[in-house]
From Swiss-Prot:
Record-listed N-formimidoyl-L-glutamate binding positions: 154, 329, 331
Organism in which the protein naturally occurs: Alkaliphilus oremlandii (strain OhILAs)
GO cellular component: cytoplasm
Functional pathway: Amino-acid degradation; L-histidine degradation into L-glutamate; N-formimidoyl-L-glutamate from L-histidine: step 3/3
Name used for this protein in its record: Imidazolonepropionase
EC numbers, comma separated: 3.5.2.7
Binding-site positions, 4-imidazolone-5-propanoate: 91, 154, 187, 255, 332
């Protein structure tokens, strides 16, 4: 077989082979390392992997792109399964307020917090929204991310939510990355509905969800299930309505108080449940039985400086397939750097480097229902490959705060070279 790309002499090839399934519990430690490895790519697919000399089955021709992996660590393309990337404006002024001890609710009363992002996003033109978001996507790509999930939720009304989701579709035409759209109109309750939140929930169910489905603008529906936002019963109503229309379910669950979001995720068998810092042991065990992927967002805990992180060790003990994501947003986690999240995962969630690699590849793929296509280096899978200028996988989270990416392939094409987006 003639091949288009040959990555040879790979010092450490981290395949994360999983046969189309997430890695649960102790399985996360097994990342399928091959020393002195090679990868053969034809078209947009991986057609061969091995160690030492390339198999005689593959023909390296004059048009084959040859990449040296000497001194490098090669992993599946990284996946960021939870972001709020499409938004306008920024909130750096809140850092000084936070340092002075001003509570978030007080910032909200002053017109800051999520409401300032909602207002900025509503005012922004489509062109402004796309231009700002494209910069963030390019940063993510430079850090080795080849697939990213993006939520709406800074509109909180039909027209503005549609604008965010349409921006995601425009961005897909401008990036080689795969973008996964999530409708999150239930991100907060608008101030005009504070006295009657049920009216807003009716609006989501009766108007927003059908309109977004008709335009085919989102694959997933997500709800912020939290005290003072959407109750368990309200969340159930929205997610069941979304599922009846064909949306897959996600849930922001038990971030601040143990409300029962993890239990609801298990009951509804959502694809994933995110945050989970306050999730009960019962809820986590139920999630394990229902094959729900927990998505930990340690960058948010780090930035909020609360000292409270999701209990990843307990999740792994219960046999859950832990995923990690940036939660990139302008308020609680303004970073596109998935490598930093990997370091925080090791240092604060006490995950091993192997577990962290599983969490940003195959388990992140499971959190967006993509394990058959991406998340591991296996024959037949999409050739999404990240090459790090690092001698082994341990070096990536160990040497934190810098970008270790040398080269990124997306669907078999080089899209980052020498650390720069092409």
């Amino acid at each position: 077989m003639n091949i288009d790309v040959w990555i040879k002499n790979i010092t450490q090839l981290v395949t994360v082979q999983a046969h189309g399934k997430p890695k649960k519990g102790k399985e996360m430690q097994d990342v399928g390392i091959i020393q002195d490895g090679w990868i053969a790519v034809a078209g947009d697919r991986i057609v061969g992997i091995g160690s030492g000399e390339i198999s005689a089955d593959f023909q390296v021709g004059e048009n084959t792109v040859i990449i040296s992996g000497e001194g490098k660590t090669v992993t599946p393309g990284l996946i960021d399964p939870h972001t709020h990337l499409v938004h306008a404006g920024s909130r750096e002024n809140e850092l000084a307020l936070k340092l002075k001890g001003v509570p978030y609710l007080e910032i909200l009363k002053q017109g800051g917090g999520i409401l300032s992002t909602v207002n900025a996003t509503k005012k922004a033109t489509m062109e402004e929204l796309v231009a700002q978001s494209k910069k963030s996507l390019d940063r993510m790509l430079s850090y080795g991310v080849t697939t990213v999930e993006i939520k709406s939720g800074y509109g909180l009304e039909l027209e503005a939510e549609i604008k965010q989701l349409e921006a995601i579709h425009r961005l897909q035409q401008q990036t080689p990355m795969d973008l996964v759209s999530t409708f999150m109109g239930a991100h907060a309750i608008p101030k005009e509905y504070k006295e009657n939140p049920e009216e807003f929930i009716d609006l989501i169910i009766e108007e927003m969800l059908p309109a977004i489905k008709e335009k085919n603008l989102a694959e997933f529906c997500d709800v912020f299930c939290e005290e003072g936002v959407f109750s368990v019963d309200q969340t159930r109503r929205i997610l069941e309505a979304a599922r009846s229309l064909g949306f897959k379910n996600k849930i922001h669950a038990d971030e601040i108080v143990p409300l029962g979001g993890a239990e609801l995720a298990a009951e509804l068998q959502t694809i994933s449940a995110e945050h989970l810092m306050a999730a009960s042991e019962t809820g986590l065990k139920m999630m394990a039985e229902s094959n729900v992927v927990p998505v930990a967002l340690p960058g948010t805990s780090f930035n909020l400086a609360t000292g409270k992180y999701a209990d990843a060790r307990k999740m792994i003990e219960y046999g859950l397939p832990v995923a990690l994501a940036t939660d990139y947003n302008p308020g609680s986690c303004p970073t596109e750097n998935i490598q930093l999240i990997m370091s925080i995962g090791c240092l604060y969630l006490k995950m091993t480097p192997e577990e962290v690699i599983s969490a940003v590849t195959i388990n992140a793929a499971a959190a967006i229902d993509r394990t058959q296509e991406i998340g591991s280096i296996e024959v037949g899978k999409k050739a999404d490959i990240t090459i790090f200028d690092a001698p082994n996988l341990y070096y990536i989270p160990y040497h934190f705060g810098v970008n270790h990416v040398d080269t990124v392939l997306k669907s078999g094409k080089i899209v980052v070279e020498k650390g720069n987006v092409i």
